[in-house]
């Protein structure tokens, strides 16, 4: 938030003499993320990707189908594929931004500007230093007037990032079960970009957590026309039926 004064002031009388909070906030955000989506705060970067993870993602493509968005291959961390950027790297996004009244603008210097931003992070990121690092970064770049506030109550929920390692015995066992059910080796994602409370299992209970897909990424989740595809539902039923069968089959070796 950049709030400089109370009320707007006529741009013809005060333009050039009053600082523009929207311009200040836009420049502040531009120091956080580059024009190509690369995070500029070093404390926000995750640990380097392991060779095992890179190998697992080899050949994995982001494809939302005919209704999904086109992938911007020049966005994100340079040198990473789109899949690696989503599943092995942190990402920063401006969820909403406002100054003045966009639907009915007036000739006035706005008193404030506000942006709701988000950092999606993977396991290994120093969560406790995310906000302090942002504050230090803004101060070092001359943006002391930009205030960092907590998210609104309706969007304040958060989960700690977690990961079940690729060489976990249960991860390998489930891969074999899925391949038995489908006849096709599964694509393995080391972690997801979404907000999932897996840390309750991996960190609190100390057990592996593994997810099997029941939908696809272009399902308009949390948006109008959220939907599922029946072929994927049928495949998901087969995956889960095969998995539970193998769990109860004494002829199948278990970890």
Model-derived segments and spans:
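Metal-dependent amide/peptide-bond hydrolase catalytic core
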Residues: 1-231, 235, 248-255
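C-terminal alpha-helix
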Residues: 239-247
């Amino acid at each position: 938030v950049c709030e400089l004064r109370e009320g707007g002031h006529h741009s013809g009388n005060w333009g050039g003499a009053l600082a523009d909070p929207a311009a200040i906030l836009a420049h502040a955000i531009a120091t956080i993320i580059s024009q190509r989506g690369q995070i500029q705060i070093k404390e926000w970067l995750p640990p380097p990707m392991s060779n095992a993870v890179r190998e697992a993602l080899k050949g994995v493509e982001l494809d939302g189908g005919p209704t999904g968005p086109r992938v911007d291959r020049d966005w994100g961390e340079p040198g990473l594929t789109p899949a690696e950027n989503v599943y092995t790297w942190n990402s920063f996004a401006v969820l909403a931004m406002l100054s003045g009244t966009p639907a009915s603008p007036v000739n006035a210097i706005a008193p404030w500007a506000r942006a709701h931003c988000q950092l999606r992070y993977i396991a290994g990121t120093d969560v406790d230093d995310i906000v302090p690092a942002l504050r230090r970064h803004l101060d070092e770049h001359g943006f002391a007037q930009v205030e960092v506030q907590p998210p609104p109550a309706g969007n304040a929920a958060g989960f700690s990032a977690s990961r079940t390692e690729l060489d976990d015995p249960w991860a390998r066992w489930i891969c074999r079960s899925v391949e038995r059910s489908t006849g096709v080796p599964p694509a393995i994602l080391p972690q997801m970009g979404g907000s999932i409370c897996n840390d309750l299992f991996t960190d609190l209970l100390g057990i592996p957590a593994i997810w099997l897909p029941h939908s696809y990424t272009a399902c308009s989740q949390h948006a109008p026309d959220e939907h599922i595809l029946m072929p994927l539902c049928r495949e998901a039923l087969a995956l889960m039926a095969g998995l539970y069968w193998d769990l109860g089959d004494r002829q199948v070796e278990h970890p």
